[in-house]
Each structure stands twice: as C-alpha cells, then as structure tokens.
C-alpha cells in the first residue's frame, strides 16, 4: 500500500487491533521532520507518525533514510506517549513490523481455559480414580464433593458427573459392582440409575429361565429337535404363561371339535392364573349349541375361549387315544411360528404313517369350517377318531376370530380367497350346495373340501389334506401380520 507524499496515514483499524488508545493532539501535531514527510517508505511502512521504525537499519528492510539524534528522540517520545511505557523502545526496534509480545485479539477466545478441555489429564483421572476407589461402596459423589473434585482436577461439574457416570457403567459391565444402584436427583444420572435398577432386577431371573428347558428363553435348537408331541406336553414356565394372556385372543384358540373336548381329562398344568379356565369347562359341558348343523364354524364363540386353562384346570391340548396328539402349548409367537414353519416336512415324511402321526396346524378358517362340517355331517365317527383330528390339530390359529376368515381376506388384503392359495379344488358338491353357502361369500371350494373330508375319513391321507397342512405356515404368517 502506498500513499502520496505528505499524506498522514491514520490506521484506526490497525491501532484498534492492538488495543492502542486513539491519537492525541500532541502526536498529530508533534514534531515531524520534512524527511519523514517526503519519505516514500515512511508512509508505507510506518503506520503512525514519528515511529521509531527508521531510527536504525532493521532486519526486515534497509531504510535509505537515517534520522538524526533530535528527530529520533522526538519520534521516540511521541511513540511512547500514546503506546505506553511497558515497551522498551530501543533505537533498532521496528515498531510496526515487530511481533508484539501481547495478543489482545486472542483474549476473547478461551484457548487456554481448562474448562474447555475435552479430555481429562492423567492427573485429573488419577484424582478421580482415587476418590472412586475410596468410595466403592457408594460411588455417588455429593454436590460438594463434585465441586471439590472439579476444583482439584480443573474440570467442570458436568465433566466430573459424566466421568463418574461412565466409571459406574464401566464397573457394572465388568461385573465389579459393589454398590446398590439408587435414584439421584441430578438429571444426568437419574435415567441411568433407573436403567441399572431394572437390569439388576432382571438379571437374577434370567439364569433361572435359561436353566429351564421348557421356558421361552431356551435355545431354539432344543425345541426344534424334539418332536411336536413331546415338546408340547411339558408344563410351561411362568414366563410362558405371562405371554398367554396377551396372545390368547388371536393365537391360542380352542378347536370346537368333540375330539378336543374329550381331552379335558388330560394332565393339569401348573402355573399362573389364566382367565380361560371357566371357558374351557363350559366348552366341555355344552359343546353342541355353539355351531348349529349345516353352518361352518365362523370363529370363536365368546365362551369358547382360549386354550390355556386356569390353575389346576384340565388341559385341552391332548386327545384321549394313546397316540400323543400334536397340539400347541401356550408359547410365544416366535416358537409357534418356528414350529409351524418346520412342520410341513414332518407331514411329508409321516403322511402315510400311523394314525396318530403329528400334523402341522392348519389355517384357522379352513380348519374351523372343516370341523363345523364334521359336526353337521351324518358320518358315524369322523371327529372322534385320532385320524380325523390329525389334519386339524389344536394349532395356534385354529378357529380364528371372524375377521380372519375368508370373506375378510379378499376384502382387505391382496391375496384373494383361500381357494387360490390351495392347489386344486376339493371333491364334493357344487359351489352352491356347500353347507355354508349362505355365509357371506365364504369360499365354497374350501367349504366343500372340508365337508368331504369330514364325511370320508379315508380321505384324510389324501393329497388334499397334505396341501391344507402344507400351506399353513404361509397363512399363519399372513394372519399374524394383521394382529
């Protein structure tokens, strides 16, 4: 930057940068020499009049102008008059180009402030660890102790609180907890301690549940390896019963067949209470009026409740004949789905086996209608024989509520009716002569097939029955997704 000769440059911005006071009249009207005014370099390199920059040759540049003694003294006096006395103005000092020992512009930024340090130093960590080791029984410093530690470690209160919260969490993960978690009034610790309490209450129960092979937390390999009948006859754990209450409405339905009602003499289950005991007893006493002749089973009757009975109540899961029946004990949805998904292979292997061979649960609407048809049919003993029960065991979705039956699937989903899901039309009368032809557009193919199955027990081993069972995992998953 160059200015014309004789121009007095007043760098207010530059002086403000270095926190210098404003010009005084003595400086502006102070003694100036003609040489300084005429100097081309004086105005360019010296931001204020009378600077000592050119008193002697400086290392930054070589001045062609040498001041005499009097102008130099006057310039030094003028320079110190407004810059201040703490600076030593030697004759060879470059006033404007030298590096000043102070940095006023950086004063507003807390670069050296320990409160803004991100990581704790080793000394601070050692101090906090020492306090923690002394208070392992109660590693919750009070407000006063936090303030004391913050002063000692030059950290903020928030940093101290966070350090102790992390230290407690770290000790808990390493199973070195020697204290009882408690709630604190501090906001930063309240949620963490509540979580710790919940985890401590749950942890003692987890080993017990895992130790019980029948519990829902048991390994999936053990349950899948066991056969369907053996896996379902054992008594459930209390944890299994807790899931019954929420899942029983749509998942654990009692198939309304007489063969199932004969199973009320099975072994009672032990465990928590269940509201379905009276309903199961009512089913045993009065099975017939719920489904009149000629009508399919539309869904569960209000009293035809859920599979899980009350404490000491009879189990509705086992059929009377010696061969163990496949039925679903009250299990969480996960195990029911896993069992049904792996059971279609069992059907293919044991399709021509003995009469009591396990068969996977069939879709709810079809099974319910088939059972309804069996009640209305004049065949002598289709529903009492174990072979009649095999294609329709007490699955998790047997006799689903009304909104799971066929009219609702094409109406509210993209899957059409059940006839498209099953491979071929079943034998039987025409589409208008089925027992449930009045039931609001129910798929007649399904009704006819169910009626034919109920009237002819020999057809239970046919391909139609295998198709019904084979499609069950798909429809079960479809039904579960709507719950």
UniProtKB/Swiss-Prot annotation:
Compositionally biased intervals (Acidic residues): 186-203
Modification sites for Phosphoserine: 274, 464
UniProt keyword S-adenosyl-L-methionine present: no
Protein's cellular compartments: Nucleus
Segments crossing the lipid bilayer: none
Domain of life: Eukaryota
Keyword DNA-binding among UniProt keywords: yes
Outcome reported for the amino acid change (mutating residue 150 to P): In HMMS; hypomorphic mutation
InterPro entries linked to this entry: HD, Homeobox_CS, Homeodomain-like_sf, Iroquois_homeo, KN_HD
GO molecular function: DNA-binding transcription factor activity, RNA polymerase II-specific; DNA-binding transcription factor binding; identical protein binding; RNA polymerase II cis-regulatory region sequence-specific DNA binding; sequence-specific double-stranded DNA binding; vitamin D binding
GO cellular component labels: chromatin; nucleus
Spans annotated as Disordered: 177-392, 423-442
Residue stretches of biased makeup (Low complexity): 266-282, 374-388
One Pfam family here: Homeobox_KN
Disease cited in the entry: Hamamy syndrome: A syndrome characterized by severe hypertelorism, upslanting palpebral fissures, brachycephaly, abnormal ears, sloping shoulders, enamel hypoplasia, and osteopenia with repeated fractures. Additional features include myopia, mild to moderate sensorineural hearing loss, gonadal anomalies and borderline intelligence.
Family of this protein: Belongs to the TALE/IRO homeobox family.
Its biological purpose: Establishes the cardiac repolarization gradient by its repressive actions on the KCND2 potassium-channel gene. Required for retinal cone bipolar cell differentiation. May regulate contrast adaptation in the retina and control specific aspects of visual function in circuits of the mammalian retina. Could be involved in the regulation of both the cell cycle and apoptosis in prostate cancer cells. Involved in craniofacial and gonadal development. Modulates the migration of progenitor cell populations in branchial arches and gonads by repressing CXCL12.
Protein's name in the database: Iroquois-class homeodomain protein IRX-5
Source organism: Homo sapiens (Human)
Encoding gene, per UniProt annotation: IRX5
């Amino acid at each position: 930057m160059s200015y014309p000769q004789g121009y007095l440059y007043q760098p207010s911005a530059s002086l403000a940068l270095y926190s210098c006071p404003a010009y005084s009249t003595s400086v502006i009207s102070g003694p100036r020499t003609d040489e300084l005014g005429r100097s081309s370099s004086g105005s360019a390199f010296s931001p204020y009049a009378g600077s000592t920059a050119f008193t002697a040759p400086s290392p930054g540049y070589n001045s062609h102008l040498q001041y005499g003694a009097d102008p130099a003294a006057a310039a030094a006096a003028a320079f110190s008059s407004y810059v201040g006395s703490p600076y030593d103005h030697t004759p060879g000092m470059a006033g404007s180009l030298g590096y000043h020992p102070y940095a006023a512009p950086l004063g507003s930024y807390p670069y050296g402030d320990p409160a803004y340090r991100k990581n704790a130093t080793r000394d601070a960590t050692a101090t906090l660890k020492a306090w923690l080791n002394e208070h392992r029984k109660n590693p919750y410093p009070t407000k006063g102790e936090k303030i004391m530690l913050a002063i000692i470690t030059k950290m903020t209160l928030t940093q101290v609180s966070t350090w102790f919260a992390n230290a407690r969490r770290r000790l808990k993960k390493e199973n070195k907890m020697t204290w009882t978690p408690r709630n604190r009034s501090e906001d930063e610790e309240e949620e963490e301690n509540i979580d710790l309490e919940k985890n401590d209450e749950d942890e003692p129960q987890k080993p017990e549940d895992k130790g019980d092979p029948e519990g829902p937390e048991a390994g999936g390999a053990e349950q899948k390896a066991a056969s369907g009948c053996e896996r379902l006859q054992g008594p459930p754990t209390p944890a299994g019963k807790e899931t019954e209450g929420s899942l029983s409405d749509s998942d654990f339905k009692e198939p309304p067949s007489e063969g199932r009602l004969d199973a009320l003499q099975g072994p009672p289950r032990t465990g928590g209470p269940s509201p379905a005991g009276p309903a199961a007893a009512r089913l045993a006493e009065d099975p017939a009026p719920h489904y009149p002749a000629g009508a399919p089973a539309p869904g569960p009757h209000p009293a035809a409740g859920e599979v899980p009975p009350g404490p000491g109540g009879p189990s509705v899961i086992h059929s009377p004949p010696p061969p163990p029946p496949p039925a679903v004990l009250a299990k969480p949805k996960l195990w029911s789905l896993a069992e049904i998904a792996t059971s279609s292979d069992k059907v293919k292997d044991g399709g021509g086996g003995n009469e009591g061979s396990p068969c996977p649960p069939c879709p709810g609407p079809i099974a319910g209608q088939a059972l309804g048809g069996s009640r209305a049919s004049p065949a002598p003993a289709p529903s009492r024989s174990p072979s009649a029960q095999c294609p329709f065991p007490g699955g998790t979705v047997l006799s689903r509520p009304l909104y799971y039956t066929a009219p609702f699937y094409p109406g509210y989903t993209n899957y059409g009716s059940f006839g498209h899901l099953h491979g071929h039309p079943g034998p039987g009368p025409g589409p208008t002569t089925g027992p449930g032809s009045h039931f609001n557009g129910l798929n007649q193919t399904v009704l006819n097939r169910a009626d034919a199955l109920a009237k002819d027990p020999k057809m239970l081993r046919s391909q139609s029955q295998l198709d019904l069972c084979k499609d069950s995992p798909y429809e079960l998953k479809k039904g579960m997704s709507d719950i």
